[in-house]
């Protein structure tokens, strides 16, 4: 047979809320009457003079420096925290531009010397009326670039087919310099034409 059993659990008792203890009043001590003086702060380090100070962007050149102003305007807020990132981006762009200019000048001088030596060689000059040559250029100098050269007694025609964006950029930026340099190296005996495809 089964008998029903009732389980009994006592009700939880809420504890009494905590009471606040009163602290006894204390008598003033000898140090209580002294005013609070904060400890001295260390002096900030002296700013390092910049050899090449950048002009301030927020003040025109005719304004006196902030230290020499007589108005009672509050000092400007601290520099933007993104300013260092902006400066780093400008520096990176400047380095990249300078290296591209250096690469362009190297490419220009290298190609100008090679092409002028080819055109001025005795074998080419005595070999016939017109020459036409197509060749792939060194990928270290101009990647994915094919040069078609046509040489006649009075004209040198250079056609560059540049498939790589860097090659196209270098040739478009330094093409006139290349043309002028070849013209000078050939002692202005031939007209130099340059095309970029």
UniProtKB/Swiss-Prot annotation:
UniProt superkingdom: Bacteria
Keywords linked to the UniProt accession: Plasmid
Xref: Pfam families: HpaP
Family matches, as InterPro entries: T3SS_HpaP
Region of interest called Disordered, as start-end residue ranges on this chain: 1-82
The protein, known as: HRP-associated protein
